[in-house]
Swiss-Prot record:
Any single GO CC term annotated in Swiss-Prot or TrEMBL for this entry: plasma membrane
Protein name: UPF0283 membrane protein HS_0596
Family statement: Belongs to the UPF0283 family.
Its membrane topology: Multi-pass membrane protein
């Protein structure tokens, strides 16, 4: 390699070329751009229920209105035809036709009564959703807007107590009314109502969810037939939703039960498996029982988690006041009980079998 000779002037020239002149900025000319990608991802995870709310309460289209009007006209026509058939049979002394007319009229009235009853139950479920939205609006108000005393929060709580069938002389309701002060804001009134009146219902709901999750996990872990597990879990989940709805004062019919199931499953689909992992954390990965548990027990744990998640979402929808972040029941709360019950039941059974052998 040939030798290179550098001059002192060349080195100084290169050093001076690397420096740039100083720049000064005024305060008004500064335009700071923040990287909001992290905030956007966080908000996207927090707002997974926003599109769900539009699916729960969609806008009624013109075709749906025409369909409802057609069904109403068709029902009125059937009722009028049955009455006309009954009158004609009586006038013409056609007794056999008269009996058939009476039976048909009875069936029509029975069907109309069932439709009206289902409609009332759907209206009741819609009222519950409206109450939840009002509670969210009250909680989202800023403290500046709550300086003036307002009775909206108290009226909302009394309406909720009436819809849930809570007696006016209930100790919890009386204790809440004694704690309410005129200077309290609507947010504080809702918080007191939730702590004094709804917390006992929440405790019962959490016990029901934990019990059903553990029982479902045990049945799947023990049962050798997959089809039996499938029908059993479906029956247990529907039964759990009915129990939670009855606990919070909602009378579910066939259509309203399907509507509630749709709400719960759509919300679970929006949340996705990432939310399940976030709730549980990575504690299970650090535990050493994965090497000891069989595939059947792992299936039982998975079914128990899904049952608990279904119950939690059903509880959130049946609860008249939207669940606050500090009141929310998470899957991690059921984790210890689920694992403890499975280990105690299954491992103790295996030890007994080994002793018998």
């Amino acid at each position: 390699m040939p030798k290179k000779v550098f001059q002192q002037e060349d080195v100084e020239q290169k050093i001076t070329e690397n420096f740039e002149p100083k720049q000064e900025f005024e305060q008004d000319e500064l335009d700071i751009e923040m990287d909001c990608s992290q905030f956007e991802t966080t908000m996207d995870r927090q707002n997974t229920d926003i599109p769900f709310q539009h699916m729960v309460r969609p806008k009624v289209t013109m075709w749906q209105k025409l369909l409802m009007a057609t069904i109403c006209l068709f029902s009125c026509g059937i009722l009028a035809q049955s009455v006309q058939w009954l009158v004609d049979s009586w006038r013409d002394n056609q007794w056999i036709a008269f009996v058939f007319a009476m039976v048909s009229l009875f069936l029509v009235l029975l069907g109309l009564g069932a439709i009206i009853k289902e409609w009332r139950r759907l209206v009741q479920l819609k009222k519950r959703l409206i109450l939840q939205e009002k509670s969210r609006e009250i909680r989202s108000k800023s403290a500046v807007n709550l300086t003036e005393v307002s009775s909206e929060g108290k009226e909302l709580c009394l309406k909720i107590a009436s819809l849930m069938g809570i007696d006016d002389k209930s100790p919890q309701l009386i204790a809440w009314q004694e704690q309410v002060h005129e200077a309290y804001t609507e947010q504080e009134i809702l918080r007191l109502f939730s702590q004094n009146v709804l917390i006992p219902f929440d405790r019962v709901a959490k016990k029901l969810i934990s019990k059903n999750a553990v029982e479902s996990a045990l049945i799947v872990a023990v049962s050798p037939l997959a089809i039996v597990d499938m029908f059993f879990i479906a029956w247990r989940n529907i039964r759990l939703i009915n129990q939670l709805a009855k606990l919070y004062g909602i009378e579910l019919g066939y259509v309203s039960r399907l509507r509630l199931l749709r709400m719960v499953f759509v919300n679970m689909a929006f949340a996705g498996a990432a939310d399940v992992i976030q709730d549980l954390g990575l504690e299970w990965l650090s535990q050493d029982i994965t090497a000891k548990l069989s595939a059947r027990v792992a299936q039982g744990i998975g079914v128990g988690i899904l049952t608990a998640r279904l119950g939690i979402k059903a509880m959130e929808f049946c609860r008249p006041i939207a669940v606050a972040p500090e009141e929310k029941l998470r899957l991690s709360h059921i984790q210890t009980e689920l694992l403890g019950t499975l280990k105690t039941t299954l491992f103790s059974a295996n030890k007994v079998k080994e002793k018998v052998r």
